[in-house]
Amino acid sequence: MSEAPIPSHWAAQRERGSFALMRLTAWAVRVLGRRTMAPLLYLIVLYFYLFGRSARDSARQYQGNLARWSGRVELQPSTRSVYRQFMSFAEALLDKLDVWSGRVGRERLVIHDQANLHASLAGPRGQLLVGSHLGNLDICRALAEMGGEVRMNVLVHTRHAEQFNRLLDQSGADNLRLIQVSELDPATMLQLSQRLERGEWLAIAGDRVPLHGGRTAMADFLGQPAAFPQGPWLLAGLLECPVNLLFCLKQDERFHVHLEPFAERIRWRRADRDAVIAQAVQRYADRLAARCLEAPLQWFNFYPFWNTQDPRRD
């Protein structure tokens, strides 16, 4: 386990102008439409592809690890495949704005839910969804719409949560809220517990460590050690709520939403808490790796994801 901050942190990169850019882009899409905005957004992403060496190297590292871990030679990275991953990200940004604007109808959703979890959306007590930055986590909004009046609370690390909520209000996203959770202090835990008791659901990404460090657990991911946040699993244990996994992958212009039950409860004793959390993190990493094979170019963590300093690599 570790509490050390991660160099070249993803959040430090995203915070720079992220809200202003999202506000401008959301306005432009509303006024000009997706068809007009798409070429501009692709040009912006192309710029970051050409001049963002760290992001290119990170995408190449991911593709190389995926190819070696899976044994699938066709997934080996190339200049073309790395470029296509960036273009997939541009497409996902446009899809994100469509979701926020309510333009993703049920006819574009394909729900894979063998346990019939989405029927629980209207239950008396909420549950926790753990997603990732593979595919489009913002489909939570469309999922909330399926539950009628169910409110979905997306837990984020950005300092601009309230500003984003104003954008959501302007787009008519009444059932979706962003909540900043920099740390799990008593006030935050009380608020989240109350939301669950009101039947609201929580969603959080399980693949990114908060900006100011935070407790992490190492897991084998695509054949290499990587640091994952303990936060989602600590949250689930403290709130004593069911935990489910959520993946949303785009295939043939439709969004395939995969809902998987993960644990009825995350329980630990003081002596074995770290071991229980580490086991949950590894299970999550295994499921995430399997989903990467279904949409290999929809991995949108463009920063050094693998911790090369982990002693297990020596």
Language model region names:
Residues 2-131, 167-169, 176, 251:
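Membrane-anchoring hydrophobic helices of lipid-metabolizing enzymes
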Residues 24, 58, 115, 139, ...:
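Short Gly/charged-rich anion-binding patches and loops
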Residues 32, 51, 146-147, 170, ...:
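Non-catalytic C-terminal accessory region of glycerolipid acyltransferases
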Residues 36, 136, 299-300:
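Short hydrophobic/aromatic residue motifs in ordered secondary structure
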Residues 81-84, 91-92, 123-183, 198, ...:
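Catalytic core of membrane glycerolipid acyltransferases/transacylases, capturing the structured
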Residues 107-111, 134, 161, 182-186, ...:
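A conditional alpha-helix N-cap/helix-loop micro-motif detector
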Residues 110, 179, 260:
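General small-molecule cofactor/ligand-binding pocket signal
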